[in-house]
């Protein structure tokens, strides 16, 4: 059992126990020692003087332990079962949204992920004021919930869940706690209090420009352009969506770059600015061969969706150029 008063993790493993008992060990020290032990069985011996010996092969550690009575009790959460979902599906949902969680402690509700369950689907949402990530999957929920789970908890859940759709994880929740139960692990966590943004209100309706493009090709183009962008030189990418192609430009004190690739563009031609990292995060987490970008206006959030289906929706805010953003109707090119 591990518990830091905000999150607790309980796991059970098979062992040849010669004498039952309880001790408390430094978690980080124990983890580092075990990870560096030679392959094979590990023996743990605790003495009455508070010394604990951990041995594997010829490697042997002796460390100070603490009394189990000093360890805080896990709370009785009273959480009610809400839904069951394949572990691989939940892990994928978490991994595809965590990048957009806010780091701004002044808005604590946005430092976690919104879990929203309806009778037939689970939605996970993250946002930081510059981008928004929404992933939905079909489920059969016993109870509808709307809770905010700390990003630290989500990281641990993702790390511990098997990437296997044959195994399942049971999610239980109430107004204060959430509990994830799967084969081998139980993870409980306090929830974040506060009101999560009504994200539906920030999603643009319709679009003036729709672009279907190859995800890998777009990522590689942005990565090349990003070579002249540094933490000190954060000039935006200037990206033009025109008939049949996407043109990426950037200029900093290190130099300038122009690159392009073919794409299926419909509607008005547009040139718009992007933070390279924010756009890359959305594209890398799309995990699909082609994406569709929908642009409603020069200063409106840009939607990134799968070319087919609707299992995710990412929003990326554009960056205003020092001069004005350009938004024009198509015109013949030389």
What are these language model-derived features?
Residues 330-334:
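A short, hydrophobic C-terminal helix/tail in secreted or cell-surface proteins
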Residues 1-329:
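Structural preference for solvent-exposed beta-strand-turn elements
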